[in-house]
Amino acid sequence: MELIYKYVWIVPFLPLSASVPIGSGSLLFPRATRGLHHIWALISISLLGIAMLLSFNLFLQQITGGPVYQYLWSWTINKNFSPELGYLIDPLTSIMPISVTTVGIMVMIYSDNYMSHDQGYVRFFAYLSLFNASMLGLVISPNLVQIYIFWELVGMCSYLLIGSWFTRPSAANACQKAFITNRIGDFGLLLGILGFYQITGSFKFRYLLGRSNESIASNEVSSFFATLCAFLLFLGPVAKSAQFPLHVWLPDAMEGPTPISALIHAATMVAAGIFLVARLFPLFKALPFIMNLISWTGGITALLGATMALAQSDLKRGLAYSTMSQSGYMVLALGTGSYRAALFHPITHAYSKALLFLGSGSVIHSMESLVGYCPAESQNMALMGGLSKYMPITGTTFLLGTLSLCGIPPFACFWSKDEIISDSWLYSTILGGIARSAAGFTAFYMSRMYFLAFEGDLRVNLYNDPIPFYSISMWGEKESGTFTETEMGSMPQLPGNKNSSSSEGVFQFSGKMEQFDGKPMEYLVITHPLDKGDPPYPKESDNTMLLPSLVLGLFTLFVGSIGVSFVQGEISSDILSQRLTLSMNHFHENHPENWSEFFVDAIPSVGIAFSSTFVAFVLYGPINFNFSSPYLWYKRDSRLKGIPDRFINVIYNWSYYRGYIDIYYNKIFTMGIRRLAELTYLFDRWVIDGIIDRVGILGLFVGEGMKYLGGGRTSSYLFGFLFFAVIFLLTIFIFIWIR
């Protein structure tokens, strides 16, 4: 056991040892490195697999009662300041590497096929291995300095991976947006670290947590200063975990390759902020204002992300807002003191969301064979439908992930989400209501995504098939009856004839009106020239892309069991309740309850999940009981005819335009900073530079004048004498005349 703890540093070193030679080889020997790209991928997967086995070993040691182990190595020995590196092994540390390595391996296996024809294949795997190494280094860090170093490395790798396709302007802008937004949180984190070093004189967790609480309790330090430092510390997780108001980078980060979304934005990077808050939980718990701030930030983020996902037409963006909402649940749990649930939900969510992202990648991969390489079309759910017929394995695994996120028992997310909702009710009825509302919205939009993508009939191959206009409400239009030219132009076009006004591969009005329930309905015709060379239907992905989805599907089915102890008559968690704590023992107590009480408490949340799923089925499901249209557009309109159109449009526009937050940020901050920069430029050019330039010009003229006056020529001296004599005489004459 002691030997295992002594060599824990190997866990992050293994993926690092894959990243360095791949990156160096791609720079020094690019052609040879690209020629061996599959070998490099195999090496990366193998080394991360060894790290995974070591992580499982550490986890087993901890849950069986292993001791907390810390190893420190000093950079320099100094009386006043001695920076240290090392690692800390405790139950919290031991559980995070499992999530990172298992999802990381699945993503690497998946990426080997997904990125096989990409020119940046080798570079992609170098960044991927470096990211895994950085994340593993972060979770075993014993002090704030080391955490900050790996925190920045994780952010840098995220920036590089999001911008993997940097030749696309949207991807380049997305990685810059992610980088700049995270700079705000990271700067706050740095100031908070320095502030608590001022309070405690140490960066080590074991000393810092105890010393800071003692200082606050004994009033040795101002509570305002401690609260300010804690707030600055919390800014880091707010940005990294995409919490409101620094969440705006996450949806745009979907411009990167889909496997990156599965790894960074499902299992690891988003969970890094949750890990840091959990690590510093005793410190935050001593400050009631910060705990309230954490809980409300999480609650607002959970509800905001859920509402923004309601009408997304882009498959990956819908999952991105889902990730934002679920990370809000985790922060909400930490703010309410539900420490166990807050660390249980990242585990269950990681496997479920990674499964969904990999499934979406398979869908996009297959849709590209129909619509070409165009993210606006291959990711658009309006062009999908019926994919479960052509991709049964992907459809089944996607359904498993959907049911899990909806909170349907016995899937993984049910066990953790239900506990968060229950604890939120105990903490605050308002927060409990927010959590349940977000759960209902989650079940609705996840079911909507599944029905639009996998049920019904494939819509991309429709030929002159009229569809009632109300079905386009998934784009969140301003009015349900009309489209402007601009709005029509913003709709995704089918392949073949871009920017065409004829009936060749574009959305257009058919020009006919029909009555339905006494209401005129305008039709939209999807016309698609079915070229003989185009494959008519999508195909199932290759085995190397299906295997990770199947493995993650098994995790989604059974990972929830680690939070449940099947003792007769009661439900508790030996692993999570008894061992998943820090050594400070200041955390929220989770008392066991019997099975009957548990299921009674779970009835409201499960009922909400089933109700929301049923509503999504009615609106977007494949079954048509009363009408001949196979696409259920008529039924959808008739079900909604009692709801005011204005109210529906408000909901759709709120979701489609991201709650108007991006627009507000763009007008207030982006445009404001640009205007300030322009004014600063003008002031610098015309005032600062103008004064300096004019002083120089004045000196030039004075010098030129003196040159002629002191040139040694008699005529110049005579001219100067006469000029100044005339000026003198005129001055005297004017003075006498005035008097």
From Swiss-Prot:
From which domain of life does this come? Eukaryota
What reaction gets catalysed by this protein? a plastoquinone + NADH + (n+1) H(+)(in) = a plastoquinol + NAD(+) + n H(+)(out); a plastoquinone + NADPH + (n+1) H(+)(in) = a plastoquinol + NADP(+) + n H(+)(out)
Print the keywords alphabetically.
Answer: Chloroplast, Membrane, NAD, NADP, Plastid, Plastoquinone, Quinone, Thylakoid, Translocase, Transmembrane, Transmembrane helix, Transport
User: From the record, what ranges are coiled-coil?
Assistant: none
Pull one GO CC term from this UniProt entry: chloroplast thylakoid membrane
The regions listed as transmembrane in this protein's record are 9-29, 39-59, 89-109, 124-144, 147-167, 184-204, 224-244, 258-278, 286-306, 325-344, 395-415, 425-445, 547-567, 603-623, 718-738
**One of this protein's Pfam families, by short name?**
Proton_antipo_N
Q: Name one GO molecular function term.
A: NADH dehydrogenase (ubiquinone) activity
What's the Enzyme Commission number for this chain?
A: 7.1.1.-
User: Can you say where in the cell this protein is located?
Assistant: Plastid, Chloroplast thylakoid membrane
Q: Return the broad EC class.
A: translocase
Q: Which Gene3D superfamilies match?
A: 1.20.5.2700
GO BP annotation list: ATP synthesis coupled electron transport; electron transport coupled proton transport
Q: How does it sit in the membrane?
A: Multi-pass membrane protein
Purpose: NDH shuttles electrons from NAD(P)H:plastoquinone, via FMN and iron-sulfur (Fe-S) centers, to quinones in the photosynthetic chain and possibly in a chloroplast respiratory chain. The immediate electron acceptor for the enzyme in this species is believed to be plastoquinone. Couples the redox reaction to proton translocation, and thus conserves the redox energy in a proton gradient.
Concerning its family, UniProt says:
Belongs to the complex I subunit 5 family.
Q: How does it assemble?
A: NDH is composed of at least 16 different subunits, 5 of which are encoded in the nucleus.
Q: What is this protein called?
A: NAD(P)H-quinone oxidoreductase subunit 5, chloroplastic
List the taxonomic lineage: Eukaryota, Viridiplantae, Streptophyta, Embryophyta, Tracheophyta
Q: Which gene encodes it?
A: ndhF
